[in-house]
């Protein structure tokens, strides 16, 4: 992590650091310590950028405080849950880290997002 941050921290295209994507630890309440530890490394090595991670279980990570540890809670999929979970987060910042494939087809975005599967894929 230290080497990664040192290598890219002067790159203007880096807007935040990501410490993981859909890690199994997100389900375990005690594993917030690991997320906090990785985030602290990022802050120590580059105090100018926030830290996120992609979490694919928004209800679980909000209820067990895993998302509350992050500077920016990154939610993968389930955009219909963003609003309710946003209100529960102390930092009140949410990033849709992986979303397009679940709510669009070939660049066509439909809002508000309805909670149902697509009838067909183009």
Describe these PLM feature segments.
Residues 1-122:
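Substrate-binding/catalytic cleft of secreted carbohydrate-active enzymes
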